[in-house]
Amino acid sequence: DVALPGRGHGFALHPDHTHAVALARRPGTFATAFDLDGDAPGLTFHAPEGRHFQGHAVFDPAGRYLFATENDYDNERGCIGVYDRADGYKRVGELPSHGIGAHELILMPGGKTFAIANGGILTHPDMGRAKLNLDTMAPNLAYVDMASGRLEDSVSYPEGRLRKLSIRHLAAFNDGRVVFACQDQGQTTDGLTLVGLHRPGSGKIEDLEAPEATTMSLVGYCGSVAVDPAGTLAAVSAPRGNRVLFWDTESRKLT
């Protein structure tokens, strides 16, 4: 096993499947890199002053650079820290996430664009895990060029009650469709649909619906997302509802 300095959240798996990085839960600042054979001690590095990790990262296709979601809390924006594995995970740059509260990011098919779940929630480490902008939060799903940081596309819920759905986790099919899961920051008894499907360039979110009783049982909270290689099924965990749900994304119906 590998000891961590504190509570972790997510992992980034190296493309060769021999190495990984565990990242701190927000507002933690540590990340620990380790080999999966367990023969060498882990290497812990930290986010710079003025930043903290958001629990998720991904390697570039070549496996040299690690891209980690961070909170630039004094400037109230999300960013992506760039860390060089070849130089002991030295931080060598950053990209904008084009939103607030960047959480999970994934590398899209083709290996050149990130999909980023900007949860829309402003936090500051001096306030612990307090959510500071629930009245004005504006989550989005952003597609960002890995090389330049340019925003290629984005989609968000319309103004109003749906803006309280914080986009947190996501996964992409090989054809580029993205499934994402939300956590409701409003009245969870409203029973809003928590899982969406987006086709880049479409400009719209397609709901992956469930029967009302099932939706209510999720208590406004969905977690991780996974998709099958065949391009049909999406799985979403619901920790507060003690279940995992499966959707057929062609029919957009729960299986």
Predicted regions and their residues:
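Surface loop/turn motifs at the tips and blade-to-blade linkers of beta-strand repeat domains
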Residues: V2-G6, F45-G50, E94-G99, V155-L162, ...
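Residue-level detector of Asp-centered blade-edge/turn motifs that repeat once per structural unit
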Residues: P15-H17, D60-A62, M108-G111, F173-D175, ...
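Short, conserved, GDST-rich strand-edge loop motifs in beta-rich repeat architectures
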Residues: T69-D72, I116-A138, F180-T193
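Beta-propeller blade signature
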Residues: C79-D87, K131-G149, L192-G203
